[in-house]
């Protein structure tokens, strides 16, 4: 199983968090430079990447 690491904004800076692309249900834009990564109805993250960057990262990770 491939796990991709994304940069997540956190207090005091950014941190790498592992995201399994299989768990990602959808990605939505969140402003011009951020994306929301949704795992289910209750769990989602906002990350400092565009939606296009996130989708490309997940495609690479899923190979």
Report residues per predicted region.
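Acidic, Ser/Thr- and proline-rich intrinsically disordered linker/docking segments
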Residues: 2-63
């Amino acid at each position: 199983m491939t796990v991709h690491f994304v940069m997540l904004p956190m207090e005091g800076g950014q941190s790498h968090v592992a995201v399994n692309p299989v768990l990602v249900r959808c990605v939505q834009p969140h402003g011009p430079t951020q994306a929301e990564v949704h795992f289910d109805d209750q769990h989602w993250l906002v990350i400092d990447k565009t939606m296009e960057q996130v989708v490309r990262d997940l495609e690479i990770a899923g190979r």
